């Protein structure tokens, strides 16, 4: 079958011209004169760091037998920074050494002690030693996972611990990964940390077809084990690189429809994040990608969740009764993994190609 359709222009990847953040300050020329390259130029994806974040205060946690790996990683991060491979400034991190017999609890205690001393300015007994610092002054923790502890258990326990009690970005690396002595691996680790700290790796130029005040929303319900978990993610900047995220358990296992209160609260918070970032303005177009919907529940989910979006939009966009509200357009896209149809573009000579 043949249908009429519109083929949008291929997006371009922005890359700052002559960018250099090595001196810890962004170049004015780099931010004001971005260059763009075609999206299919994949060679640049591994080298671009559009918004570098300087790594100043950070710490490595490892067993005594892995200290030399931590020292090597510390040196290599700094040397890669000096070589200006990707314009991220990396200072030397502290190395916190644990005995080789240490288990998960010992790692937790070491993280607690370091956070208490550096951020809170207290010793292990709670006595104030120095003036407290802000959490944001501590950039991230890097944990070298030893072979002697089951890595899945260590990762889960420490990730939950850090997120709950020590709100600091964390990165986990196995000792085997460091022993590969591959700069490409180390660069990827730095880029992952940069992204976790809020620095954009690359940005897309969407052209005039997409409004600068567009919010992109992803919603999924994951069913695993005894729980069903809601995942919610919404962009709030014009480049669609900054995200508001939330996750919470459903009321019962297998439940696909998200309750009214939860969904409205998520959208309300996402709109507030957009408002805070855009001088009080709200999106004029909302794209929603809804995943995790079975065929049997699709109609109910669409009807229920669109109704909740309409309600919260009416509340958020009609705050001033003296003004006529400019309600946003919204586009709902249901993600279906079981798709057999394929679409091709018909060329001038009746040849077909991917659009």
Spans of model-derived segments:
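Long, low-complexity, intrinsically disordered terminal regions
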Residues: 1-355
């Amino acid at each position: 079958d043949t249908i009429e359709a519109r083929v949008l222009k291929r997006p371009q990847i922005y890359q700052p011209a002559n960018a250099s953040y090595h001196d810890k300050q962004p170049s004015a020329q780099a931010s004001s004169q971005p260059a763009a390259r075609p999206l299919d130029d994949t060679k640049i994806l591994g080298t671009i760091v559009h918004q570098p974040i300087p790594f100043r205060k950070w710490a490595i946690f490892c067993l005594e037998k892995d200290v030399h790996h931590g020292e090597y990683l510390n040196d290599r991060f700094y040397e890669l920074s000096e070589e200006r491979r990707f314009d991220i400034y990396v200072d030397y991190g502290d190395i916190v050494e644990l005995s080789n017999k240490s288990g998960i609890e010992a790692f937790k205690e070491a993280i607690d002690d370091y956070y208490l001393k550096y951020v809170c300015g207290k010793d292990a007994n709670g006595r104030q030693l120095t003036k407290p610092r802000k959490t944001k002054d501590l950039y991230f923790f890097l944990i070298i996972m030893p072979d002697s502890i089951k890595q899945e258990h260590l990762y889960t326990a420490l990730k939950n611990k850090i997120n709950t009690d020590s709100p600091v970005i964390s990165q986990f690396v196995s000792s085997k990964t460091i022993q590969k002595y591959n700069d490409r691996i180390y660069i990827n680790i730095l880029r992952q940390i940069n992204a976790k700290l809020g620095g954009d790796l690359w940005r897309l130029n969407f052209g005039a077809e997409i409004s600068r005040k567009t919010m992109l929303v992803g919603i999924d319900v994951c069913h695993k084990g005894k729980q069903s978990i809601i995942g919610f993610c919404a962009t709030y900047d014009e480049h669609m690189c900054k995200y508001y995220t939330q996750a919470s358990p459903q009321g019962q296992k297998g439940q696909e429809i998200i309750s009214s209160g939860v969904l409205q609260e998520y959208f309300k918070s996402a709109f507030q994040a957009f408002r805070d970032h855009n001088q009080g303005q709200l999106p004029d177009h909302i794209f929603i990608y809804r995943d995790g919907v079975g065929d049997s529940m699709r109609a109910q989910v669409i009807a229920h969740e669109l109704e909740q979006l309409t309600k919260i939009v009416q509340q958020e966009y009609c705050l001033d009764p003296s003004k006529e509200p400019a309600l946003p357009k919204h586009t709902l896209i249901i993600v279906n993994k079981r798709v057999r149809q394929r679409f091709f573009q018909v060329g001038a000579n009746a040849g077909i190609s991917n659009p």
